[in-house]
């Protein structure tokens, strides 16, 4: 199967251009295209299993600045009393599958089609997609996954099976990233769930300038994968 290599706009052309910079089918969801897209602040935004996939750089972008994170007393209490444990990349396939299966009132169905699941699993094997897991004993009760664009991590999707589990996954991740020098993360779209944690929207120009600065820091956020086949 021929898999196209996409050429994405960047710099001023991207900052002043349209929100949808390309439209493809699922064959374009390659590790190489995903790497190139995320480094430019672009992400695929599938609308369904068979629909064309738009590659987007929205004019308004949601971000979570870690110094503005407001967990609130309820979440702080849950963190103290839950007895849950947290991990990174322990169960990426289970996390992305749970995100795909999660029911979301604001959308019909899921954008995480089998092709998307396969593409981001390949990106995980390549060391650039990562997961956070929340465990209640041996049970996976929440988590999220996202993409490391090369020293800057952005979230893609999250899920919870127990109240507060996805929020605590974000809180754990924010602490982890802040300890490694990252000050904020891309969350793409603002939802009420994330707004309650302190997330907000910025313009595309502000986002792209911040992304360039973060990528220029040359950080290594995650250790190399020990087994790239998993």
Describe every region a protein language model picked out:
Residues 1-230:
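N-acyltransferase acceptor-side catalytic subdomain
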């Amino acid at each position: 199967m021929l898999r196209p290599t996409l050429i994405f706009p960047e710099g001023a052309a991207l900052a002043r251009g349209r929100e949808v910079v390309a439209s493809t089918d699922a064959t374009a969801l390659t590790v190489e295209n995903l790497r190139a897209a995320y480094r430019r602040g672009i992400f695929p935004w599938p609308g369904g299993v068979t629909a064309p996939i738009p590659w987007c750089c929205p004019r308004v972008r949601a971000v979570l600045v870690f110094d503005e994170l407001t967990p609130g007393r309820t979440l702080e209490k849950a963190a103290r009393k839950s007895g849950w444990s947290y991990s990174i990349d322990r169960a990426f396939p289970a996390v992305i599958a749970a995100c795909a299966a999660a029911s979301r009132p604001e959308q019909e169905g899921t954008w995480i089609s089998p092709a998307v699941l396969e593409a981001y699993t390949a990106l995980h094997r390549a060391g650039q997609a990562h997961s956070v897991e929340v465990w209640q004993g041996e049970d996976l009760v929440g988590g999220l996954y996202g993409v490391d664009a090369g020293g800057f991590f952005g979230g893609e999707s999250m899920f919870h099976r127990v109240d507060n589990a996805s929020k605590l996954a974000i809180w754990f991740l924010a602490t982890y990233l802040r300890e490694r020098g990252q000050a904020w993360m891309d969350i793409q779209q603002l939802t009420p769930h994330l707004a309650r944690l302190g997330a907000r929207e910025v313009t595309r120009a502000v986002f792209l300038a911040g992304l360039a600065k973060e990528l220029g820091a040359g950080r290594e956020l995650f250790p190399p994968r020990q087994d790239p086949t998993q």
